[in-house]
Amino acid sequence: MDIFSIANQHIRFAVKLATAIVLALFVGFHFQLETPRWAVLTAAIVAAGPAFAAGGEPYSGAIRYRGFLRIIGTFIGCIAGLVIIIAMIRAPLLMILVCCIWAGFCTWISSLVRIENSYAWGLAGYTALIIVITIQPEPLLTPQFAVERCSEIVIGIVCAIMADLLFSPRSIKQEVDRELESLLVAQYQLMQLCIKHGDGEVVDKAWGDLVRRTTALQGMRSNLNMESSRWARANRRLKAINTLSLTLITQSCETYLIQNTRPELITDTFREFFDTPVETAQDVHKQLKRLRRVIAWTGERETPVTIYSWVAAATRYQLLKRGVISNTKINATEEEILQGEPEVKVESAERHHAMVNFWRTTLSCILGTLFWLWTGWTSGSGAMVMIAVVTSLAMRLPNPRMVAIDFIYGTLAALPLGLLYFLVIIPNTQQSMLLLCISLAVLGFFLGIEVQKRRLGSMGALASTINIIVLDNPMTFHFSQFLDSALGQIVGCVLAFTVILLVRDKSRDRTGRVLLNQFVSAAVSAMTTNVARRKENHLPALYQQLFLLMNKFPGDLPKFRLALTMIIAHQRLRDAPIPVNEDLSAFHRQMRRTADHVISARSDDKRRRYFGQLLEELEIYQEKLCIWQAPPQVTEPVHRLAGMLHKYQHALTDS
């Protein structure tokens, strides 16, 4: 009977959700809002959404941030809705079609921006559609409806935030501190594996896990930043630690790859040193102190460059880690580390995927419009709203089909649950605000527990039930209206699910190829003598792309190794002492243009032609390096890069 069990850790958030719903309900009726349902629905969604995503009680700041995004999305949607209505009030059908395109446009943008901010754009898309559909009988009331909707949503968000603060939300700071310690130990153990040069699959698993953990730590940093302004210093340090952690992974993996061709570079001194096992961050601290003494004794020239760079990055990591844990004032040494290179933002590789999402949302909304006009069903507008909601919110997630199924299950569960409230509970409690609040608190409490378990349909059931029960001012009980609303939700979700199934997303392979070509372009762009360009920090963006590649192609080790090799080539060439002269500078610009053409090529033939041109230019570039007497630190990584591109040219050019 575990399915009905209530764990202790789930109770606090369930009470928090119930409190948010009750507060929104009380305030909505107290201020005589026309539809307090919107305030209650907003409070429930803002509070429960982060809990469903986290699989438990969300950390401090998550609910506030989601509420902030909802306010932004609502205001953008309301303004867009007003503009569309004012411009096209004389052509109602065209007005609705433009709203469908607007919803698709917002979904397209939400597919390209950071996933944390995509919620606001998805909301902006279907908010405009809700306004246009709702004011169809009385278009002159549009400004009043937009203002009322914004007011009700702001009230719901404030109630959710108040409930969150009332029940002392969890701080993520202790989790961050523990992860910093554990991550440093894991970094040292990865370097041990790479120096031993053992089983490649074990090394692949180790660095893959570290990439995921570093990405997760970056997510924790975002949560900590949302939690309170007092963590501003810790946030700055964590941002630099992210780059240092990625540097440690890169240097470790390069140490492994170097031994494939030149194992003699790693001397017995370092092999014996890294044989000592470590279990805690304190062990790593002791080993790093000893390692710095060994390097001082052997000299920088006798130390492999990857080990020297790794030790330098690990030392800086340790220094910043202590600052994060104590949250003390940033000293001069730390400030020097934090004043690092500016991070580079890379263009999204998911443009084709975003266009698929645009068509899914637009076509599903147009299909809903045709269904509404053809049937003349009074709740066709409700079906359209659900179509827009499902497609706008589902498209940005890794598995839109499962999100649509979750909504279908939720709306089906909402029918009997809403029926119970509509026919029995609310008619018998509407005369008493206390009883009405208690009845909705019970609903919020039990669904809050299920939401934290990520039960299929729980989130959809919470929103759909609140949406169909009578929480208007004044309350009117028309069974046909209730049934229409409930069935409209179900039909809308089914239509959205149908469109998601019919409009297939085949962009995965294209996205993977674009990502790999972006790695190639980054490696080529590192060959420059421009001081400002050499100081740019590409590492976070490159590993963000690698993380996306790992999510798109789980278990595809050849792709991961190729991407990692390109990242290593980029880092090595970025620091290489390339001779400074106009001849090489002009050729660097030419190679960058060719690499950009490879990424932007529309057909396989063009892509192969430009890629072949890039390989030829790399051969010429190696000859130029010999003419200008470039040192081995330059010629060797360029030769390795050219060899890798020759070896994998089919994977990088074919669809």
From Swiss-Prot:
The chain crosses the membrane at residues 13-33, 38-58, 69-89, 93-113, 121-141, 152-172, 370-390, 407-427, 431-451, 459-479, 482-502. Signal peptide: none annotated. Its main location: membrane. Residues 34-37, 90-92, 142-151, 391-406, 452-458, 503-655 are cytoplasmic. Residues 1-12, 59-68, 114-120, 173-369, 428-430, 480-481 are periplasmic. One of its GO terms (molecular function) is transmembrane transporter activity. Keywords: Cell inner membrane, Cell membrane, Membrane, Transmembrane, Transmembrane helix, Transport. It comes from the Bacteria. One of its GO terms (biological process) is carboxylic acid transport. One of its GO terms (cellular component) is plasma membrane. It is a multi-pass membrane protein. It holds the Pfam family FUSC. This is p-hydroxybenzoic acid efflux pump subunit AaeB. The lineage of its organism: Bacteria, Pseudomonadati, Pseudomonadota, Gammaproteobacteria, Enterobacterales.
